[in-house]
């Protein structure tokens, strides 16, 4: 292996600490070409699609990318913000807010973000940290619930980048925070604030709150992935915080891809069944997504909404993700701070003069 070129080591180096917030990724533009490039990287990850690569790559290159590239580009165009992709825009804002909050509390750390797929990538971010004199890095995936297809592959990419370094930094990882009290509080506050502005569902009349998490193939649960259980744990804690029963609130899973069985119940069919059963209002919230993106704005806000209304429902609400909510920025900063314990995160104070 050839290692990356590095400057000579120096005892006078900055010895800085870096916090890297890592999200899934996004195309650079809502165009078929950019979307195909992004999907090719994403769907080529063996952590994401556990099919023999020799077979999968033929299907991916000849069938899936040509068909999904153009269709997905139209969906991205429908949610694209003036500043860019929603996921990137919100992640940038979260990064700035966490940096500001930590700095205001006396933390002397660098805070940046990266994407597992697309740009800015993890390798580039770690290289920038190294050039700035960072010798300790906290990897903070923006996935509250652990899954091999999200959290583990994020760490894979980071360790691949570290493997090319001769002088590696000390590294810590945040595996999950599915049950962290500050995270649960931020979720509950997001729902409460939305209801304060738009009215609370009439649960006595049969209205429903649906907590929709991103789905994964069911076989991953059978193979030991803890994602399903952690989603259920988050859902139960959030229901308790909101004072709701399992009759009033349901955990579901969205974004199924392919014909294999995924975690159930599926979100869209559940909403249609609610409509057909006479449910008048349904609110959907996505606790596993810390920032709004295609899967929340388009899939939930448009496709799932249409399923509910087609089934006979009358009022649909998509509760925005945590995004830049103050409770979430506080929670995220708290989780980061807890995982920085033991490192010299605060600037050294001068010795008092006698």
UniProtKB/Swiss-Prot annotation:
Its EC number(s): 4.98.1.1
GO annotations of cellular component type: cytoplasm
Keyword Lyase attached: yes
Pfam families xrefs: Ferrochelatase
UniProt keywords, alphabetically: Cytoplasm, Heme biosynthesis, Iron, Lyase, Metal-binding, Porphyrin biosynthesis
Subcellular location: Cytoplasm
GO molecular function, one term: ferrochelatase activity
Reaction equations catalysed: heme b + 2 H(+) = protoporphyrin IX + Fe(2+)
EC supergroup of this enzyme: lyase
Cited InterPro entries: Ferrochelatase, Ferrochelatase_AS, Ferrochelatase_C, Ferrochelatase_N
Source domain of life: Bacteria
Residue ranges of the TM segments: none
Binding site for Fe cation: 214, 295
Pathway(s) where this gene product acts: Porphyrin-containing compound metabolism; protoheme biosynthesis; protoheme from protoporphyrin-IX: step 1/1
PROSITE patterns linked: FERROCHELATASE (PS00534)
GO biological process: heme biosynthetic process
Family: Belongs to the ferrochelatase family.
Function: Catalyzes the ferrous insertion into protoporphyrin IX.
PANTHER family the record matches: FERROCHELATASE, FERROCHELATASE, MITOCHONDRIAL
Protein name, as recorded: Ferrochelatase
UniProt organism field: Burkholderia cenocepacia (strain HI2424)
Upper classification of the organism: Bacteria, Pseudomonadati, Pseudomonadota, Betaproteobacteria, Burkholderiales
Gene that encodes the chain: hemH
């Amino acid at each position: 292996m050839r290692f990356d070129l590095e400057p000579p080591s120096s005892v006078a180096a900055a010895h800085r600490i870096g916090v890297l917030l890592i999200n899934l990724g996004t195309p650079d533009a809502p165009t078929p070409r950019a979307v195909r490039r992004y999907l090719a990287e994403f769907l080529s990850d063996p952590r994401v699609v556990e099919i023999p690569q020799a077979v999968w790559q033929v299907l991916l290159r000849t069938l899936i990318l040509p068909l999904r590239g153009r269709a997905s580009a139209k969906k991205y165009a429908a949610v694209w913000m003036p500043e860019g992709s929603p996921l990137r825009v919100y992640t940038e804002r979260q990064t700035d807010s966490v940096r500001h909050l930590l700095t205001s509390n006396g933390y002397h750390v660098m805070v940046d973000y990266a994407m597992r797929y697309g740009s800015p990538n993890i390798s580039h971010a770690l290289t920038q940290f190294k050039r700035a004199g960072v010798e300790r890095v906290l990897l903070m995936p923006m996935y509250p619930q652990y899954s091999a297809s999200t959290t583990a592959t994020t760490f894979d990419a980071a360790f691949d980048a570290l493997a090319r370094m001769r002088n590696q930094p000390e590294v810590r990882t945040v595996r999950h925070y599915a049950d962290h009290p500050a995270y649960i509080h931020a979720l509950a506050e997001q729902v409460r604030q939305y209801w304060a502005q738009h009215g609370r569902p009439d649960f006595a009349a049969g209205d429903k709150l649906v907590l929709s998490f991103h789905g994964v193939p069911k076989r991953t649960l059978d193979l030991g992935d803890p994602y399903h259980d952690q989603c259920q744990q988050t859902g139960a804690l959030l229901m308790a915080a909101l004072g709701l029963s399992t009759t009033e609130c349901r955990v579901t899973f969205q974004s199924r891809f392919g014909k294999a069985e995924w975690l159930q119940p599926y979100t869209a069919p559940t909403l249609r069944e609610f409509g057909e059963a006479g449910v008048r209002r349904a609110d959907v919230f996505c606790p596993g997504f810390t920032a709004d993106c295609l899967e929340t704005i388009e899939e939930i806000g448009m496709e799932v909404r249409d399923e509910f209304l087609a089934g006979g429902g009358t009022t649909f609400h998509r509760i925005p993700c945590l995004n830049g909510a103050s409770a979430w920025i506080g929670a995220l900063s708290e989780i980061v701070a807890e995982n920085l314990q033991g490192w010299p995160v605060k600037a050294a104070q001068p010795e008092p003069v006698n």
